[in-house]
Amino acid sequence: MYLDIDKCAIGNSYDKPYQVVFHEAGHGIDSACRKLVNESGVFASHFSGAYKGGLFPQTIKDEVMELVNAYDKQLKQEYKARGEKYYKVYAYKALENEIRAYNSYARADLSDILEGATGGKVQCGYGHGAKYWKDRTIGGISDGLATEAFAEMTDSTMSNPESLELIKKYFPKSYKIYEKMLEVMLNG
């Protein structure tokens, strides 16, 4: 891992000081601990992707779909009442607009996770791009989503309380799995 520590120390418009250090350290830990998971038929490159057969990225996706489906239900009714045609893309856009209302420090990590979980259908200003997520799906497991979410949760836990608050709000089940993964990593 190579970082410009002087730049990391001051942060930027969406990362708090040292947040990038904790993010990259999260990736390093996630990769180094991969060997702790010995699940047959799981080809993920990272601990977070391999853990319990992809439980972490699947839970993230499930939580995102719960949010999208809640908007979908509400918006369908509103559009029907007005006699207008409705498309599910409106639900994704509504979630995106909700997240974009938060400041950059609070939403950047969440934005990346949402982009990964939706394959780019939700883009809140920060992310890796749709191709990144597609290229990092291994054996049906969204390994890219897993490792980025692991790193985002690590950096927010260590250096960005605003971001952590939103992650816990939008991904409570996934964050609990993150904590369980840390326990497994620590206990080897």
Where is each model-derived feature located?
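Active-site-flanking segments in enzyme catalytic domains
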Residues: M1-G188
